[in-house]
Amino acid sequence: KLLVKDDGIIAGIEFAKQVFTYVDPQIKIEQLIKDGDPVSYGDIAFYVEGASQSILKAERLVLNAMQRMSAIATKTNTFVKLLEGTKTQILDTRKTTPGIRALEKWAVKIGGGTNHRFALYDMVMLKDNHIDFAGGITKAIDKTKSYLKENNLDLKIIVEARDLDEIKTILKSDGVYRILIDNFNYEDTKT
């Protein structure tokens, strides 16, 4: 059985089922709770039945993944709850642990967050260096839109803002999907 050792949001049950089944298709799993459910110390997530060698072979990977995923889902859910009633979403980052990005981003979704970008290829992000090199925000956005059109690419544009004036400039531009606020203090984010 998988015994829950802390309160939080459980994550990684579907992954655990895949691992156990991959190691031994004869393993039987009785699932009692699902990914995203709130759990408390002492809850049982599932029972596993099968050859002890197969269970032990999969056990450490399952436990490590579920601990990490549940921690991420729990932390994400804490912030999601704080923002209930607003239009604000919790987004994850592309900066993840090498080799387990998919699991970490899956955990964010389980916790109620939204995936930002999976990799460099799925959105265009204009950072401060790009903006400076292009000669300003408006020029950077216009050049990016032209490039996307010329190359028949359907990618969303995200622009990083360093201050409130840059946000105002970005908001006047057409075609920006998201604004990334960089190192803003709490008071500035409320503005």
Residue ranges and their predicted role:
Residues 177:
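Receiver (REC) domain switch/active-site residues of two-component response regulators
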Residues 1-173, 190:
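Acidic/glycine-rich phosphate/pyrophosphate-binding loops and surrounding catalytic core
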Residues 171, 180-191:
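Short glycine/threonine-rich loop/turn motifs
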